[in-house]
């Protein structure tokens, strides 16, 4: 069963923008998450100065095996994004409009 991770972030840098975060995600962090075993990852504009990253892994085991690397990416990302991690949670995907393998 797929495992979904959701992190929410708040921009704290004075010069960073959501476009800056988007560029970093596309260039560096999406490829990094996929290399760690993620099936898919998305960046979402949550509101004003906040954004969320939603990542789908094939299973909890795949995510758990990569958790140390994911933590390092989050720390590095916080600095590069000019944002602070507000919350991180995850769980088994129970249903989806898209077929999950």
Predicted segments with their positions:
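Short S/T/G/P-rich N-terminal loop/turn motif that feeds into the first structured element of a domain
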Residues: 1-52, 56-75, 79-101
């Amino acid at each position: 069963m797929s495992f979904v991770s959701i992190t929410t972030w708040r921009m704290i840098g004075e010069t960073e923008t959501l476009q800056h975060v988007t560029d970093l995600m596309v260039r560096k962090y999406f490829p990094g998450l996929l290399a760690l075993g993620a099936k898919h990852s998305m960046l979402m504009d949550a509101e004003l100065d906040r954004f969320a990253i939603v990542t789908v892994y094939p299973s909890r085991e795949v995510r758990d095996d990569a958790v140390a690397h994911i933590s390092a990416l989050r720390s590095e990302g916080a600095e590069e994004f000019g944002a602070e991690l507000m919350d991180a949670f995850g769980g088994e995907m129970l249903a989806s409009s898209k077929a999950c393998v």
